[in-house]
Design a protein with these regions (language model features):
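N-terminal, positively charged nucleic-acid-binding surface of large information/translation enzymes
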Residues: 1-2
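Acidic carboxylate-rich catalytic motifs and surrounding loops in phosphoryl-/glycosyl-chemistry enzymes
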Residues: 7-13, 157
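Alpha-helical recognition segments enriched in aromatics with Gly/Pro capping
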Residues: 16-229
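Short, intrinsically disordered, charge-balanced linker/junction segments flanking boundaries
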Residues: 238-241
Length: 242
């Protein structure tokens, strides 16, 4: 059973805090503005890579073998990431640097800073594919702004594959939880999700789903039979609920 969250922050409602946050990083020397864009100086955070194990020097070395884009040429280092991007398309916000939008790494950090004491949460979750660069960049900003990591513990779940292929819109093999629940029922869906460790990938195939349906059916039948036995033998509820 999932309860509704106490808070449902929106980026559009956090823009004043985002602008102040970015300006604070500029004032501290952790960020710089170039042609209306604002970038974070990754090399100033010695703890960078503490989550993913990635080394800054390896990132720099890797970038030396490829052609840099126009945006990358603006940066002091290829490892630096955008806190703010100037744009004349879509939703735009006014700032001291330009009309534009915040970088997605920054949005999350600022909303956490706004809602939680000292800008730190106990558990930060997300997909394994977000560990780097997204979560690593969140940590870097928190270290620069707060002087400590953004979370005490991290939980990264693996991906769901369909017949051995990554589930993605581009492949057209996306399965929605609501559709699986309608077709197979809540118990089958929950059993399927719990059939593997959250840090291991789940490969969904017709064979796997058939197997899960059989397992759930066995448990449901056993539960019904046990309940019927207790009722027939007049076992008081308070006795078998202990």
């Amino acid at each position: 059973r999932c309860e509704d969250p106490t808070y449902k922050p929106r980026v559009t409602e956090t823009m004043p805090e985002i602008i102040d946050f970015i300006q604070a990083l500029i004032d501290k020397g952790y960020a710089y503005e170039v042609d209306g864009d604002v970038y974070f100086r990754v090399t100033k955070v010695k703890e960078y890579g503490m989550l993913s194990g990635i080394k800054v020097e390896d990132l720099i070395a890797g970038a030396s073998d490829r052609t840099l884009s126009v945006d990358e040429k603006k940066k002091e280092s290829t490892t630096d990431f955008a806190l703010w991007k100037k744009t004349d398309e879509g939703i735009q916000f006014d700032t001291p640097w330009s009309k534009g939008r915040p970088g997605w790494h920054t949005e999350c950090v600022v909303m956490i800073n706004k809602l939680f004491k000292d800008g730190k949460i106990d558990i930060h979750g997300g997909g394994q594919d977000l560990k780097f660069p997204h979560h690593e960049n969140e940590i870097a900003q928190s270290m620069a702004y707060n002087g400590h990591p953004i979370a005490n513990y991290w939980m990264h779940n693996q991906m769901i594959n369909i017949d051995g292929e990554k589930m993605s819109k581009s492949l057209g093999n996306v399965l929605w939880a609501k559709d699986l629940i309608v077709e197979f029922g809540c118990n089958v869906f929950k059993w399927l999700m719990l059939s593997t460790h959250y840090r291991n990938p789940l490969n969904m195939t017709e064979k796997v789903i058939v197997g899960v349906r059989k397992e759930v059916s066995k448990v449901e039948n056993a539960t019904k039979n046990a309940s019927l036995y207790l009722q027939v033998n007049h076992v008081p509820a308070h006795d078998y609920k202990k």
